[in-house]
Amino acid sequence: MSEHRVNHEPVFLLASSPWRESSLRVEAFSRRYGRVALLARSARKRQSELRGVLVPFVLVSASWYGSQELKTLHRAEWIGGWPQPQGRALFSGLYVNELMLKLTVREDPLPELYDALAEVMEAVCCKAAYIDDLRRFEWRLLNLLGVAPDLNRDGDGGTIAAGGTYLVRPETAVFPVGKGFAVPPHAAGVVAPGQSLIDLREGSFRTAESLQQALKITRLFIRHLLPEGLKSRQVLEQIRQFDRKETARETVPTSDGTASNAV
């Protein structure tokens, strides 16, 4: 079997883990080759040219060779384009990478998904408010994976109406329901206004309600695909709980009975 070589391919690094004594095993996503597994030999050595280059969230130019599933990375250069995310944005970047790692298969080219990944990474790294971008990315990912329902027409063949109410469930079409309809306990589903579905389809969230409904819907499908959950989301939730406890501890009553921050 001939040895396949790829040179100077822009990639996003999704994850890396130690390999033997001094190497790294890297999962990367490229526009032309999809997700690829790369072995970066001696990358953990202090004198390695790869040290400090193999970082997530920004573009890296990678060159590799090999005919097996695990390729050998022989060159990498930092392309950059934006700074590394900080604070909560860091967890959002990790969340996006974890979705890509768990929901894509190796060597399945998805150019549109690569473009969506580039857009959301730039937003997370550069914008103060990027929640809209996360919801757009999640929905594009679900669409490109073929698991998102059609939001142009409902299961009865009718056009999604802005004033209607619809039941959204995994693995089935969207169906119209009455405004008082409630999802049965322990059943997976979201009841959403038609306008929210239109906004999600178009990627333009006109109201806070539409953005909240988008979160419920994308989370519904992601939980269906990944029932074991996401580590990045669990860690962020733990931080949020810690922050809430700290806020409650630092807030003490004043002499007039109102609350005041003690710090």
Curated annotation (Swiss-Prot):
It holds the Pfam family RecO_N. One of its GO terms (biological process) is double-strand break repair. Residues 252-263 have a biased composition (Polar residues). Residues 243-263 are annotated as: Disordered. InterPro entries: ARFGAP/RecO, DNA_rep/recomb_RecO_N, NA-bd_OB-fold, RecO, RecO_C. Keywords: DNA damage, DNA recombination, DNA repair. One of its GO terms (cellular component) is bacterial nucleoid. PANTHER family: DNA REPAIR PROTEIN RECO (PTHR33991:SF1). Belongs to the RecO family. HAMAP family: RecO. Involved in DNA repair and RecF pathway recombination. Involved in pilin antigenic variation. NCBIfam families: reco (TIGR00613). This is DNA repair protein RecO.
